[in-house]
Regions:
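Positively charged n-region of N-terminal signal peptides that target proteins for export
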Residues: 1-5
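Compositionally biased regions
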Residues: 6-8, 206
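Hydrophobic h-region of N-terminal signal peptides that target proteins for export
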Residues: 9-18
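Carbohydrate-interacting regions of secretory-pathway proteins
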Residues: 18-208
Length: 208
């Protein structure tokens, strides 16, 4: 009985190990990703969508062909256009909606009023957690490069924008999936151009 108890205690406190970081974007092609080829393209070492000349007609997503569970994701991004309307985001623990251009899952949001926030796309359709306006005023950079770090471990989700922790969220709904694809978004409804690069992921696992 004592041996079993010690095992349960040990197993409950297993350290989380990170694999070597892997790049999800080769800087030249969209290999490993799937999406509307009329929307998504590669320019100067970045994944690009949208336009500064015409409004983006609808939400579009570029999705990984692989699914992920626990991980730490780092993405460098830039958003341009109408500052009040331009919006984008990085989806994770997400799935494609069959026969539809939309996806469903968590999003690290980008844009006026949403910087650094955790949004639930096409599911609960609301901001789940986010930083104060004062934090965003000091952290977010429109029309310049920004860094998002997204860390998922079990039901814990943390977001960092340019090194500042903006979300520390615990998902209480056990029905919400803890695995899924990663996707890049350009939001419809405004003149928006979004660029993503330096996309790396470290998959996390418990030490045996």
């Amino acid at each position: 009985m004592r041996t079993i108890s010690l095992c349960l205690l040990f197993c409950g406190t297993l350290p989380i190990l990170a694999a070597e970081p892997k790049s999800l974007f080769d800087g030249k092609t969209l290999a490993g990703w799937g999406g509307d080829e009329k929307t998504w393209r590669v320019e100067d070492g970045a994944i690009v969508a949208g336009s500064l000349e015409v409004s983006v007609p609808r939400n579009e997503f570029l999705c990984t062909t692989k699914t992920y569970g626990d991980f730490e994701l780092n993405v460098k991004f830039k958003i341009l256009g109408d500052k009040d309307k331009a919006n984008a985001g990085i989806q994770f623990r997400t799935k494609r909606i069959p026969k539809h251009h939309e996806v469903s899952g968590f999003q690290a949001d980008i844009g006026q009023g949403y910087w650094g926030a955790l949004y639930d796309e096409s599911r609960r359709n609301k901001v789940l957690a986010g930083p104060s306006k004062e934090v965003i005023a000091k952290t977010a950079k429109f029309d310049d490069w920004n860094d998002y770090k997204i860390r998922c471990e079990g039901n814990s989700i943390k977001l960092w924008l340019n090194g500042t922790l903006t979300v520390d969220y615990t998902e209480k709904d056990e029905k919400i999936e803890t695995t899924g694809i990663i996707a890049l978004q350009v939001h419809g409804g405004g003149k928006t151009k979004v660029l993503y690069k330096n996309i790396t992921i470290e998959e996390l696992s418990a030490k045996n």
